[in-house]
């Protein structure tokens, strides 16, 4: 009995560390990009997946200790997909005591009507969903719309655009919506997917499957995700280094004439970013930029199940 109690304490200790890391990551992202301001009303988009559940939980947690006042309203879009468990999210949110709104729109029917059988439906579905969420944000008086994309999503998008789109373009932590009326934020921008997965497992969130519409996964994104996971296993710290690179862009040493005036370089011009010194042999740090070994990494692997609560 004492041994079981000791194991429980150990689990609680390590999971508290995990939650603190997620809180720290979210807090840093909020501060770096000025995501949340005094008096904000944040519309938290809740899909029923691990990412959005974690985002809501961490924002609720930060709300209690933040130096500013802000409110949260959770919003789920019920798209009338066959098999969607309508009771799950209302029951969960009622238990938490969180303000929420369930928006019912038969976008599934519209997509099935417009898109021929066998063709991908994700693009049209995404546009419809985005428009409904923007409208709902206006109706609720929300000043910010929070989405649950994390660090891995951002890196995947960068590589997708490089490999398939010919652009160095990622997924910004904060942006203006395409209708020019809403600010969209991604509070999990600095969070690792594997941390989110562990947290979701520990909290036993009532996960709703994401493939109820019957659509096929984005195979290109899946290839990129598998590649990054493989790199993360074989070369610890590479993911952190790549994400750090997204925050340390040097336009003068790329090739985009819209970002840097290469034609303006003439004799007597100022040396920019070290000039050709940048091509000298650099000392590569032994430890990848942005990466720190974690004492509890192996311990957390053992704690994916059999945990009741993280306080």
Curated annotation (Swiss-Prot):
Enzyme nomenclature, EC number: 2.8.1.-
Pathway: tRNA modification
Cofactor remark from the record: Binds 1 [4Fe-4S] cluster per subunit. The cluster is chelated by three Cys residues, the fourth Fe has a free coordination site that may bind a sulfur atom transferred from the persulfide of IscS.
Cofactor(s) annotated in UniProt: Mg(2+); [4Fe-4S] cluster
Pfam families with a match to the protein in the record: ATP_bind_3
Binding site for [4Fe-4S] cluster: 122, 125, 213
GO biological process: tRNA thio-modification
One GO cellular component, as annotated: cytoplasm
Alphabetic keyword roster: 4Fe-4S, ATP-binding, Cytoplasm, Iron, Iron-sulfur, Magnesium, Metal-binding, Nucleotide-binding, RNA-binding, Transferase, tRNA processing, tRNA-binding
Role, per record: Catalyzes the ATP-dependent 2-thiolation of cytidine in position 32 of tRNA, to form 2-thiocytidine (s(2)C32). The sulfur atoms are provided by the cysteine/cysteine desulfurase (IscS) system.
Description of how the protein assembles with itself and partners: Homodimer.
NCBIfam families, per the entry: PRK10696.1
Further comment: The thiolation reaction likely consists of two steps: a first activation step by ATP to form an adenylated intermediate of the target base of tRNA, and a second nucleophilic substitution step of the sulfur (S) atom supplied by the hydrosulfide attached to the Fe-S cluster.
Family as reported in the entry's similarity comment: Belongs to the TtcA family.
Protein name as annotated: tRNA-cytidine(32) 2-sulfurtransferase
Name of the coding gene: ttcA
């Amino acid at each position: 009995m004492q041994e079981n109690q000791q194991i429980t304490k150990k689990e609680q200790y390590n999971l508290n560390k995990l939650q603190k890391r997620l809180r720290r990551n979210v807090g840093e992202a909020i501060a770096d990009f000025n995501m949340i301001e005094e008096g904000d009303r944040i519309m938290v988009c809740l899909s029923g997946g691990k990412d959005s559940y974690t985002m809501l939980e961490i924002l609720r947690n930060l709300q209690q200790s933040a130096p500013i006042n802000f409110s949260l309203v959770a919003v789920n879009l019920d798209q009338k997909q066959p098999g969607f468990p309508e009771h799950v999210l209302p029951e969960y949110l009622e238990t938490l005591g969180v303000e929420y709104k369930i928006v019912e729109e038969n976008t599934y029917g519209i997509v099935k009507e417009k898109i021929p059988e066998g063709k991908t439906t994700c693009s049209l579905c995404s546009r419809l969903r985005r428009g409904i969420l923007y409208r709902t944000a206006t109706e609720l008086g929300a000043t910010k719309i929070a989405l649950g994309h994390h660090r891995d999503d951002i890196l995947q998008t960068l590589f997708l655009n490089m490999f398939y789109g010919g652009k160095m373009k990622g997924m910004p932590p904060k942006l203006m919506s395409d209708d020019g009326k809403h600010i969209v934020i991604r509070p999990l921008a600095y969070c690792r997917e594997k941390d989110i997965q562990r947290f979701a497992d520990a909290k036993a969130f009532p996960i709703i499957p994401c493939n109820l519409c019957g659509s096929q996964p984005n195979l290109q994104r899946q290839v990129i995700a598998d590649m990054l996971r493989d790199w993360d296993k074989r070369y610890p710290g590479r993911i952190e280094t790549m994400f750090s690179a997204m925050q340390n862009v040097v336009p003068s040493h790329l090739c985009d004439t819209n970002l840097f005036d290469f034609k303006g370089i003439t004799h007597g011009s100022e040396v920019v970013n070290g000039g050709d010194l940048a091509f000298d042999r650099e000392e590569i740090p032994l430890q990848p930029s942005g990466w720190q070994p974690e004492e509890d990494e192996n311990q957390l692997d053992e704690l994916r199940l059999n945990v009741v609560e993280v306080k």
